[in-house]
Amino acid sequence: MDTSELFSRWTATCQEIQAAAAACGRSADDVTLIAVSKFHPLEAITALAARGQIDFGENYLQEAQEKIAGCQQNVRWHFIGHLQSKKASATAGNFALIHGVDSVKLAQRLQRDRKSVV
């Protein structure tokens, strides 16, 4: 997908969020758009970040770590999808939010690992 198509889709999505929020008497600021960036190059992420997109979602840890390390923009990373217990330590220090925690044991491990990183 080229940059102009990416911007066009992102802009359309933002407009849909604004319209939906207005229709139910809410502010679009109450909604967080997480741009799923898996399989997209770092250049696309930095281009959207430059336009104001802050939240990005990844579900492949190795790919995400490369992007996080290379990203100079002020973004907030989300881990989306299933998280394996063996990847909890690496995930805890790289992501602001982790979606899809499916057990208390995993949540406790993330909490412990997060404390050791912070």
Feature names for model-found ranges:
Residues R26, D30-F95, V104-L106:
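N-terminal active-site wall of soluble small-molecule enzyme domains
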Residues L110:
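Active-site-adjacent structural elements in enzyme catalytic cores
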